[in-house]
Amino acid sequence: MVSWKGIYFILFLFAGSFFGSIFMLGPILPLMFINLSWYRWISSRLVATWLTLPVALLETMFGVRVVITGDAFVPGERSVIIMNHRTRVDWMFLWNCLMRYSYLRVEKICLKSSLKSVPGFGWAMQVAAFIFIHRKWKDDKSHFEDMIDYFCAIHEPLQLLIFPEGTDLTENNKARSNDFAEKNGLQKYEYVLHPRTTGFTFVVDRLREGKNLDAVHDITVAYPYNIPQTEKHLLLGDFPKEIHFHVQRYPADSLPTSKEDLQLWCHRRWEEKEERLRSFYQGEKNFHFTGQSTVPPCKSELRVLVVKLLSIVYWALFCSAMCLLIYLYSPVRWYFIISIVFFVLQERIFGGLEIIELACYRFLHKHPHLNSKKNE
């Protein structure tokens, strides 16, 4: 049964992303055609203000407890984040970790392309220059090249989240993963899926070539009690009681240099995840970490609490104010309608705002294709 908590959570997030896209991100879009550096600097910070909202709601309103062990992030460092894909919404729960240990404004996510069409959420993700993929390497490789080369060219300090497993852990997906393991003489997994390493190795190599990689962060996520597998579970009010993250930081210069060794390195991390998660779920449901973190959290819990409270207050007032302005003033209503039409049409015609941003960079810097010099 749908719960009021779930409805409140989804509607609040939708309203924030919808009105935020139109009234906060919409006015800065022309800056894309004038100064891309300023556009990216401003848009990243505006989007990050919304990313604090689900963190605030989950922890402050619904009592979700977050436990983080292991390493943190060097402030401002550029990294690739690899994580097991336990549920379809792990990418959102990760914000609870990054809000404490890193900066939300530098995160980029590889997501399935259908999400960019979702009103509000998808529009903001396009402005944030998330990387949308079709999960077919022959279709995704060129887009990966363009986006990563663009980030390297503008010296964007990104932290790129990749799910090497490619999909979330369900019984059907686990059966397919184990069939693959049996055919290839590999270990069968219970708590993770076998990773697909092609995209991971490509991204790491490309970022290293562009001198835009400081580390790889290997994050293991676990849910000791209830596991909200899909967005539907959130709508039903099935929020996780606890989310545990274990972070391991690997400096870029410690990674293997060859593609084959990097693939093997990734597979070893997943073998470790399987054992770590087995100990977690069959034991005390904690990640046992006896060593010391090499990097401490960059924010205190008091600072995080203040940000969460301010986020809820700001977005509640902002959404209410925008509704009032739309009701009272016809110019605002016209702007509202025109903006919606623009966001819908630009995606259908051009493929998304991140594609337009790439085209602007090519035009302003006279680069017909960002990857033309590196293509095989």
Swiss-Prot record:
Query: What Pfam families does the database record attribute to this sequence?
Result: Acyltransf_C, Acyltransferase
E.C. number(s) listed in UniProt: 2.3.1.-, 2.3.1.51
Organism's domain of life? Eukaryota
Membrane topology listed for this record: Multi-pass membrane protein
Catalysis: reaction(s): a 1-acyl-sn-glycero-3-phosphate + an acyl-CoA = a 1,2-diacyl-sn-glycero-3-phosphate + CoA; a 1-acyl-sn-glycero-3-phospho-(1D-myo-inositol) + an acyl-CoA = a 1,2-diacyl-sn-glycero-3-phospho-(1D-myo-inositol) + CoA; 1-acyl-sn-glycero-3-phospho-(1'-sn-glycerol) + an acyl-CoA = a 1,2-diacyl-sn-glycero-3-phospho-(1'-sn-glycerol) + CoA; 1-hexadecanoyl-sn-glycero-3-phosphate + (9Z)-octadecenoyl-CoA = 1-hexadecanoyl-2-(9Z-octadecenoyl)-sn-glycero-3-phosphate + CoA
Q: Which positions does the motif HXXXXD motif occupy?
A: 85-90
| Chain coiled-coil ranges | none
List UniProt keywords, sorted A-Z: Acetylation, Acyltransferase, Developmental protein, Endoplasmic reticulum, Glycoprotein, Lipid biosynthesis, Lipid metabolism, Membrane, Phospholipid biosynthesis, Phospholipid metabolism, Transferase, Transmembrane, Transmembrane helix
Top-level EC class, please? transferase
Q: Which InterPro entries match?
A: Acyltransf_C, Plipid/glycerol_acylTrfase
Q: Name one GO biological process term.
A: cardiolipin acyl-chain remodeling
Chief localisation class: endoplasmic reticulum
Where does the UniProt entry place glycosylation sites? 35
Can you say where in the cell this protein is located? Endoplasmic reticulum membrane
Q: In which pathway does it act?
A: Phospholipid metabolism; CDP-diacylglycerol biosynthesis; CDP-diacylglycerol from sn-glycerol 3-phosphate: step 2/3
Q: What does UniProt note about where in the body, tissue by tissue, this protein is expressed?
A: Widely expressed with highest expression in heart, liver and 12.5 dpc aorta-gonad-mesonephros and lower levels in the 16 dpc fetal liver and adult bone marrow. In bone marrow, highest levels are found in B-cells compared with whole bone marrow, T-cells, erythrocytes, and granulocytes.
The family note in this entry says:
Belongs to the 1-acyl-sn-glycerol-3-phosphate acyltransferase family.
Q: What does this protein do?
A: Exhibits acyl-CoA:lysocardiolipin acyltransferase (ALCAT) activity; catalyzes the reacylation of lyso-cardiolipin to cardiolipin (CL), a key step in CL remodeling. Recognizes both monolysocardiolipin and dilysocardiolipin as substrates with a preference for linoleoyl-CoA and oleoyl-CoA as acyl donors.
| Entry note about domains | The HXXXXD motif is essential for acyltransferase activity and may constitute the binding site for the phosphate moiety of the glycerol-3-phosphate.
- Name by which UniProt lists this protein: Lysocardiolipin acyltransferase 1
The source organism is: Mus musculus (Mouse)
